[in-house]
């Protein structure tokens, strides 16, 4: 939901892409973040009271559930009828649909962390992170004109840039807790933008625009 507006064009293209891949037998777990909605609520709460980190995290988790319900409805019958949150309670053998949509589960990290936990349970080694930023940069490109794209980086280097401390609502390409788990599990995370054609290229093993962390 960039700038408070639903990206309808992106959702239509994503649904078409996943529907086509599903027809070939591919299956998807989509974990939704809280995005700008989460940050708006967190900031609003901070201006009224002094919330604990746990309270801010729970508020963020519920915004991810709203986003997940929305995405689940977008995919209709392709999607599992309920959203998921707890990776430990997710029964892989009972997963019959092409798509499962989920959100956050518990405080202490973003949905990036939950994504890695689901990937570990499913035995996946590659995770795709879709956002409104096409690449990882050396600095925030919105603030610094000399920011440079990073197309490939190790987990050690990435964690050195981002640190290891999680703060509720923090805006980073991939959260510190999830990064630590992904590194330990020897996973790769592809940071891609919202260009579905680019996403298709990645899945097809073609040249794509984005950053790979491994």
Q: For the regions a protein language model found, what residue spans apply to each?
A:
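C-terminal catalytic "cap/lid" subdomain
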Residues: 1-214
């Amino acid at each position: 939901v960039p700038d408070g507006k639903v990206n309808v064009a992106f959702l239509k293209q994503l649904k078409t892409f996943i529907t086509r891949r599903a027809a070939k037998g591919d299956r998807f777990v989509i974990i939704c973040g809280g995005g700008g909605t989460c940050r708006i609520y967190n900031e609003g709460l901070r201006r009224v009271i002094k919330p604990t980190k746990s309270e801010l995290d729970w508020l963020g988790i519920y915004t991810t559930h709203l986003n997940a319900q929305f995405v689940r409805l977008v995919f209709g019958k392709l999607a599992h009828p309920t959203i998921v949150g707890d990776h430990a309670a997710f029964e892989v053998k009972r997963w019959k649909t092409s798509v499962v949509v989920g959100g956050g589960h518990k405080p202490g990290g973003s949905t990036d962390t939950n994504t890695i936990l689901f990937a570990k349970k499913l035995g996946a080694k590659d995770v795709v992170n879709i956002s409104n930023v096409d690449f990882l940069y050396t600095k925030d490109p919105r603030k610094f004109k000399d920011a440079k794209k990073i197309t490939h980086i190790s987990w050690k280097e990435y964690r050195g840039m981002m640190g290891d401390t999680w703060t509720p609502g923090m805006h980073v390409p991939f959260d510190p807790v999830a990064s630590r788990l992904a590194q330990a599990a020897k996973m790769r995370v592809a940071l891609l933008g919202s260009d579905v054609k680019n996403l298709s290229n990645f899945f097809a093993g073609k040249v794509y625009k984005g950053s790979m962390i491994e």
